[in-house]
């Protein structure tokens, strides 16, 4: 574990709530980039920004075809970077996708994508994590409520909240097929979870979150205070959200599959140290140790 002062304690004997110690926007309001000043203000207030169409239909078709190629490739399935759904035994996620696929690497470098990350974080950025997510119809399980930063801080060693994620839809996101839910404004309070981090926790948590999960009481208070926003939209839409937003998604029991590309950008001025609340680092395909800026 790290010896750096821990601004956001977690995984102790009791659940704790700490006001955010970091800015939400690290750039100045007039920082050039694709996000308008009004949208930056909205992002700072709510913790997220929805973009109705980030990429066009032809691009959606390209990325969706690449996703399908990867999840049906036996070599990819056998790779430790692929996570399999426990019940159906179908691929749920493929990590480090920007290193596996040049097509997705190009998406990461696209100025519409990385430019927004630089604008929000106020610096050059690198990819802390990338993956494709697949939620087939008829029973694909969801992700329980959590803050990504809680995990990235506790288990990967990210010191500060200077990280932003983008989820780019490759299928239609209906209000019924297990879409992303966020508690608006929850990013301004850090919820430190109770309980020590088990050894090799990542192997279990990538299929079903346990350690780092808030209590029912805390979630009820946050939901009463902030409400819950469900994100819908056409293929090609995108949602940017702060690393500390409480978010989750439900099971997909509809016939309509849902898939997306998920990219996590971290500031080059916030590189990972040793974990704050775990005995060892998670593997690099989950939490990068290559801090090379995206160019």
Swiss-Prot record:
Cofactor(s) the record lists: Fe(2+)
Keyword entries, A-Z: Dioxygenase, Iron, Metal-binding, Oxidoreductase
Enzyme class: oxidoreductase
Catalytic reactions on record: L-ectoine + 2-oxoglutarate + O2 = 5-hydroxyectoine + succinate + CO2
Domain of life: Bacteria
Gene3D superfamilies: q2cbj1_9rhob like domain
Binding of Fe cation, residues: 146, 148, 247
Enzyme nomenclature, EC number: 1.14.11.55
GO biological process entries: ectoine catabolic process
Binding residue positions for L-ectoine: 129
Site (Important for ectoine stabilization): 152
InterPro entries named among the record's database cross-references: EctD, Phytyl_CoA_dOase-like
Binding note for cofactor: Binds 1 Fe(2+) ion.
Amino acids binding 2-oxoglutarate: 135
Keyword Iron-sulfur: no
Pfam families: PhyH
MF terms (GO), sorted A to Z: 2-oxoglutarate-dependent dioxygenase activity; iron ion binding
Subunit structure: Homodimer.
Role according to the record: Involved in the biosynthesis of 5-hydroxyectoine, called compatible solute, which helps organisms to survive extreme osmotic stress by acting as a highly soluble organic osmolyte. Catalyzes the 2-oxoglutarate-dependent selective hydroxylation of L-ectoine to yield (4S,5S)-5-hydroxyectoine.
Protein family (similarity comment): Belongs to the PhyH family. EctD subfamily.
NCBIfam families: ectoine_ThpD
Name of this chain's protein: Ectoine dioxygenase
Species per Swiss-Prot/TrEMBL record: Streptomyces avermitilis (strain ATCC 31267 / DSM 46492 / JCM 5070 / NBRC 14893 / NCIMB 12804 / NRRL 8165 / MA-4680)
Originating gene: ectD
């Amino acid at each position: 574990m790290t010896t750096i002062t821990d601004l956001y304690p977690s995984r102790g004997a009791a659940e704790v709530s700490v006001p955010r110690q970091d800015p939400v926007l690290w750039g100045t309001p007039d920082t050039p980039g694709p996000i308008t000043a009004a949208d930056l203000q909205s992002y700072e207030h709510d913790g997220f920004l929805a973009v109705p169409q980030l990429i066009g239909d032809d691009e959606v078709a390209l990325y969706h075809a690449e996703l399908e190629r990867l999840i049906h490739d036996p070599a990819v399935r056998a790779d430790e970077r692929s996570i399999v759904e426990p019940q159906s035994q179908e691929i749920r996620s493929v990590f480090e996708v920007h290193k596996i696929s040049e097509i997705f690497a190009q998406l990461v470098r696209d100025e519409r994508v990385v430019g927004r990350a630089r604008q929000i974080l106020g610096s050059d950025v690198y990819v802390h994590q990338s993956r494709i997510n697949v939620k087939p119809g008829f029973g694909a399980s969801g992700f329980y409520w959590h803050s990504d930063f809680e995990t990235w801080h506790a288990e990967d060693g990210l010191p500060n909240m200077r990280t932003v994620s983008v989820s780019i839809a490759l299928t239609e996101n209906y209000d019924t097929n297990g879409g992303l839910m966020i508690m608006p404004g929850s990013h301004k309070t850090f919820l430190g979870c109770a309980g020590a981090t088990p050894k090799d926790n990542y192997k279990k948590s990538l299929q079903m979150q346990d350690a780092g999960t808030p209590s029912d009481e805390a979630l009820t208070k946050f939901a009463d205070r902030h409400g819950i926003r469900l994100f819908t939209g056409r293929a090609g839409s995108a949602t940017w959200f702060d690393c500390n937003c409480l978010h989750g998604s439900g099971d997909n029991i509809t016939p309509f599959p849902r898939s997306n590309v998920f990219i996590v950008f971290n500031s080059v001025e916030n590189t990972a140290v040793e974990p704050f609340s775990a005995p060892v680092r998670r593997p690099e395909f989950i939490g990068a140790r290559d801090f090379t800026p995206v160019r």
